[in-house]
């Protein structure tokens, strides 16, 4: 059975194409809920007008659906709390010049 950690690890493969870094390191992944074969991914984007939003959501859907045992993936886009660079990992801040 898939675990939350499995999903988070897989989501390192979803990249924000504008920033060239994955959504986990960017702090865009807010939560992952796993209930048997069902996975719910709660995430944000760097801005409300992010042109890469639909592509990021498609990638989340694809990556999570490819995990063994996952039958249903729900994706929730949230703006609460609003994303800020403070949510990025230390490595991401350094690489992108925020550190």
Model feature map: region roles:
Residues 1-99:
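Domain-level signature for proteins that mediate thiol-based redox and metal-cofactor handling
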